[in-house]
Amino acid sequence: MNFEWNERKNEINLDKHGFDFTDAYRVFDLPMVVDLNERDDYGEDRWIGTGMLDGRVVVVVYTEPDELTIRIISLRKALSHERKRYEQYFKN
């Protein structure tokens, strides 16, 4: 799997959320809760994955422009309700 992102967007994300997109691939190495982002019409399917990174529950928003590529849009710490859902999902 190949990962790509807009470097300017990565810089903004790093300043805002403290996460670098270069670490995002590690979230995909572990189980995630994944939902289709239907909040807005982006002209493409955007996915919201909730998973683990360095012992923290995080949310990664991404798209799959083709079968071999994941484009990272955002990476941030999970909100309380997102963390609880993730923990409940993988409780057993």
What are these regions (language model features)?
Residues M1-N92:
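Ribonuclease/tRNase effector modules and their secretory precursors
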